[in-house]
Structures are given as structure tokens and as C-alpha cells.
């Protein structure tokens, strides 16, 4: 079960329990999980197809939306397929390398989603606070630079987690009371000192907080600019362009904050609640994001409606 690596013992496999305490109803729990995953697949693929086929959707906000949908597809697939394997086929065992790989992908894609939301906030800030300079500020070169930051920064923040996990000793513990692999879930199985893992985890969380603060600052300027507009119609029109983005921010950050608080301070909360919240944090945003943008954005739902009418 364990192999030796430079005086550090690693298990050859981990055992993912799924949702501790609810093992007998895993089959029933899988139904909403599978449904939400299918909604995420259908919704995000639809968004990508509409943006690709509609020549009018070439504004930067739709470019960021396409990136968001791509990340949502990757994040939901990385997490939900492993969960369904546990629920349906009792595929609890996962190799050490595969577990670390899943940990890296989940944390990296989650970080990328936070970066995209920040980029979208910047887009809305420029569109409302400096509309005459919108096309000169958000040029193709700037969009390319932002896209690289969206990918590179989360990857660089997540890579040290691999090093930290590989340098932990694992004595006899290999059972993870979770349905997927994440950094602290693996670290807590170690019989060594995980203080550096804990500190680094908080360091990574601080970047999510920083992004949220920057988004908040951008919306302070946006609201100031909106309320300076002369007519109520102009104010409502400006605010309506931010509605979808605000909805997506809430869908992403509210479950993540709740998950963080239950993990840090909810010691009296049953373990299965912790795991369910952590699962919802990964699967709900990818399924709701395309719905929010599809309903609120006329340029998105009109082509979809035309396609159904033709059929």
C-alpha cells in the first residue's frame, strides 16, 4: 500500500469515501449531481457555440465569457466524474499521482474562474466609466495579456501545492473523507508537520480575497459613474449590463465563503455537511453561469431561440 521515496513514505493509492455518513444513499445523491453536471455541459457548450457562430459577439466581454465557459467545463468534468464514479461504481481508490493531479486541476481551474470574474469586472468598469476609450483600452494585445494572466497566475499559485504534498510523510493513513482530492484534505493524512501547508493554503485564499476586493472597488466606481448619468433610463441601462456579472460573482463567491467558514470554524457541523458544501462550491457555478448569462444577455438567448424555432 505504501512506497518509499527519499525517506518519505507515500501511499500507492488513496481511498475516497465520498460523502461520509451518507454512503447508503450515494445512489440517490448521484441523481442531482449528474443532473447539474449535464446542465453545466449543455449550458456551457451552448454558450461557446453561440459565441463562435454569431459574428456580432466579438466584444471583450463575450471573449471573457467564452473563457469562463471553457473553465467551467474543465472544472465540472475534473470534479464531478470522479464523484459519479464513487457513487455509481464504488470506484473509491485513486492512485497517489492521480489524486495529486486532480488536486492541482481543481485548485488551478478554481483560481482561473476567480481571475476571469476579475477581468469581467475590469471590462464593465471600462465600458461604463470610460465608454469612449473602451476599444482603445481593451485592445487585442491587452486581451491576450489578460488571458495569459488568467491562466498563468493560478497555475503558479497551485504548483507549490504539489511540492508540499510530495514532501509530506504518510504513515498508515490513506482514507480521505471526501469525494475528491484537495490540498488540505491530502495534507491532513500526513503524520508530519503540515503547518507550512496550512499557511500556504491561507496565502492562496488571500488572492481570492484580493480579487473580490478589487471587484468591489471597480463596482464602487461603476455605481458612482452610473448615478452621475442624467436620466433614470440611462442609469437602468448601464446597470442592466452588470446584472449577469454580479449574479455570476455571487454564485461563485457565496458558496466558496460558506465552504471556507464551515471548514475553518464549523467544528460542530456534521462532516457530511462540510463535504456537501465543498461539492456544491465546485458544481453549482459551472451549471448556473450559462443560465445567468443566457437569460440576462439578449445576444445569447436570441440565437438559441432562433435555432429552436427553425427546428
Predicted regions mapped to residue ranges:
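Transmembrane helical core of 7TM receptor-like proteins
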Residues: 1-311
Amino acid at each position: 500500500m505504501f512506497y518509499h521515496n527519499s525517506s518519505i513514505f507515500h501511499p500507492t493509492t488513496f481511498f475516497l469515501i465520498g460523502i461520509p455518513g451518507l454512503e447508503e444513499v450515494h445512489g440517490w445523491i448521484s441523481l442531482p449531481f449528474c443532473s447539474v453536471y449535464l446542465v453545466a455541459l449543455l449550458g456551457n457548450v451552448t454558450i461557446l457555440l453561440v459565441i463562435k457562430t454569431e459574428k456580432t459577439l466579438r466584444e471583450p466581454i463575450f471573449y471573457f465569457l467564452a473563457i469562463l465557459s471553457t473553465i467551467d467545463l474543465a472544472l465540472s468534468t475534473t470534479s464531478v466524474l470522479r464523484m459519479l464514479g464513487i457513487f455509481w461504481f464504488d470506484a473509491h481508490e485513486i492512485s497517489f499521482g492521480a489524486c495529486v493531479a486532480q488536486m492541482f486541476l481543481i485548485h488551478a481551474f478554481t483560481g482561473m474562474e476567480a481571475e476571469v470574474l476579475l477581468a469581467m469586472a475590469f471590462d464593465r468598469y471600462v465600458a461604463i466609466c470610460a465608454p469612449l476609450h473602451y476599444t482603445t483600452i481593451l485592445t487585442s494585445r491587452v486581451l491576450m495579456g489578460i488571458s495569459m494572466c488568467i491562466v498563468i497566475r493560478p497555475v503558479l499559485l497551485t504548483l507549490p501545492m504539489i511540492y508540499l504534498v510530495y514532501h509530506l510523510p504518510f504513515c498508515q493513513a490513506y482514507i480521505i473523507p471526501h469525494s475528491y482530492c484537495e490540498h488540505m484534505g491530502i495534507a491532513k493524512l500526513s503524520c508530519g508537520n503540515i503547518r507550512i501547508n496550512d499557511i500556504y493554503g491561507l496565502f492562496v485564499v488571500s488572492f481570492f480575497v484580493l480579487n473580490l476586493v478589487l471587484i468591489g472597488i471597480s463596482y464602487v466606481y461603476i455605481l458612482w459613474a452610473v448615478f452621475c448619468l442624467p436620466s433614470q433610463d440611462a442609469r437602468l441601462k448601464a446597470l442592466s449590463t452588470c446584472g449577469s456579472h454580479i449574479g455570476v460573482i455571487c454564485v461563485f463567491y457565496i458558496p466558496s465563503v460558506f465552504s471556507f467558514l464551515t471548514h475553518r470554524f464549523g467544528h460542530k457541523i456534521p462532516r457530511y455537511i462540510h463535504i456537501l458544501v465543498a461539492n456544491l462550491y465546485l458544481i453549482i457555478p459551472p451549471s448556473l453561469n450559462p443560465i445567468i448569462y443566457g437569460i440576462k444577455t439578449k445576444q445569447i438567448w436570441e440565437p438559441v431561440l432562433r435555432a429552436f424555432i427553425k427546428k
